[in-house]
């Protein structure tokens, strides 16, 4: 493209990173050849900054909540001390997008967070 847009005065957290000059042919070629490494480095840096684990993308899997008490907490981070974002009840369907240690990265009714993997049965 011959036009570059720049977002300023955002109302949400944002990161503006300049890796090279996209209008320089050598830089543009370098970016194209290294885009995966650049993306992975940015993600690792941001997850470290925000103190959340980097979870490699995995195909989404459908799971069922299996608790014998009130509900399963969907948390902001993979920690029992993390803020609770939502409650999933026994038998609720949940989408599992990845795993970090004994925590699943889940999407429950549009809420993305972490849930203890011991209480989710993955459907085959």
Predicted regions and their residues:
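SH3-family beta-barrel domains
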Residues: 55-73, 86-90, 98-100, 121-124
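Short alpha-helix capping/helix-loop boundary micro-motifs
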Residues: 78-83
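Extracytoplasmic
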Residues: 12, 69, 101-103, 115
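A short macromolecule-binding patch
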Residues: 109-120
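Active-site-adjacent mobile loop/cap segments within catalytic or ligand-binding domains
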Residues: 1-57
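Anionic group-transfer/hydrolysis microenvironments
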Residues: 20, 75, 118
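SH3/SH3-like beta-barrel fold
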Residues: 91, 104-108
């Amino acid at each position: 493209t011959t036009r570059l847009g720049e977002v300023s005065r955002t109302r949400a957290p944002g990161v503006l990173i300049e890796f090279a000059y996209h209008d320089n042919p050598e830089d543009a070629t370098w970016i194209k050849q290294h885009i995966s490494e650049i993306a992975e480095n940015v993600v690792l840096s941001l997850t470290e900054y925000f103190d959340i684990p980097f979870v490699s993308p995995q195909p989404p899997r459908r799971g069922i909540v299996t608790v014998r008490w009130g509900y399963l907490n969907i948390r902001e981070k993979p920690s029992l001390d993390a803020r609770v974002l939502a409650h999933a009840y026994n038998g609720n369907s949940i989408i599992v997008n990845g795993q970090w240690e004994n925590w699943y990265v889940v999407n429950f009714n549009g809420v993305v967070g972490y849930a203890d993997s011991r209480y989710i049965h993955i459907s085959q």
